[in-house]
Amino acid sequence: LVDTGAFNTFLDAALVADLHMPTQRTEMAFSDFRGQRSEANIARITDLLLGDFHLPAQKLFVLSNGLSADASRIAETHIFGLLGADLLTTQHGIIDLESMSLFLK
């Protein structure tokens, strides 16, 4: 899911667990649009593909299962993560609304 209003990119906690990615606690927390707070853990990714795009190694926030489930229910499909403004900016994201396509460099 592309969320241009999200400052950061998040991965689904269940996906992170399934891929056996180690997580690290932080002192930060975040909240959803209803004010539900969740601790902000991070996972270091080294080899992740988004379609044909190879995402460079970096640390990404982990979205708690509760918040991820809410987003999936609203979207009526499973959400594996949110692409936020941080990734869209650093990877020069272009959103083509006519073809509903996302291009990353």
State each model region's role.
Residues 1-105:
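Pepsin/retropepsin-fold aspartyl endopeptidases
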